[in-house]
Amino acid sequence: QWAKSGAPQGDPALTPAQPKLPDASEWQLASELGEPDFVVKSPPYTVTANAQDQWWVRNTSFAGLIDEPRYVRATELKGSYPLGVKVLHHGHAQLRSNDGNGNRTSGPVGRQGVGKGGDRFPEGTGMLIYPEGTINWNLHYFPINEAVPNEQAEAAVWLYPKGYKPEFQTRGEQFFAADSGPGGLWANDLLLPPNSVKSQ
């Protein structure tokens, strides 16, 4: 009936108040954890004003920010302010390192999606990172009818105090393709017992 009547406006006095949106220039986790221990930036990329979706995949060196292995408490990824936050639709920043014994390790130092905040591990859970490695940036940009020159996504990392060893260690979010053939995982290789410890 309302639509057939031409969708007349209701009583403006009954309009709900606008929700308080977070300040896009600030780290959302900073209100809980303080400023991050360090921030890394992606290589600059110019987002074209009018085009199809744009993918930016690059590697950057990770060195000089920590001097020993440390446990990550939380991470957050966002576009630069003010325009980068408008064009970065979603993305991942993955730190790849060696553990000193020749074993490769990897874990996220930032994941972003529209409307998503940062990622904080539960108390007593941390992700171990090493002083040197490579950050793989995989960023999806969507044009906004305005060129955004030299956009640099930013990944913020909060660490546990030096010397802290959490009860549980995680590698964060991991990607794999089940049933992918020889050498790959099969669906029945992954067993998640009910009521077990959850670290994400």
Q: What label would you give each PLM region?
A:
Residues 147-200:
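Extracellular secretory-pathway ectodomains of glycoproteins
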Residues 59-71, 125-130, 161, 188-200:
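Extracellular and analogous surface-interaction loops
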Residues 72-75, 126-144:
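Noncatalytic modules at the cell exterior or secretory-pathway interfaces
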Residues 47-54, 112-117, 178-183:
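Extracellular beta-rich ligand/substrate-recognition surface
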Residues 79-82, 92-101, 154-166:
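Short edge-strand/loop segments of extracellular domains
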Residues 82-124:
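A surface-exposed loop-and-adjacent beta-strand signature within N-terminal beta-sandwich domains
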Residues 66, 79-87, 143-148:
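Extended, low-complexity, turn-rich repeat/linker tracts enriched in Gly/Pro/Ser/Thr and Asp/Glu
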Residues 1-62, 132-138:
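Aromatic- and Gly/Pro-enriched helix-to-coil junctions and flexible linker segments
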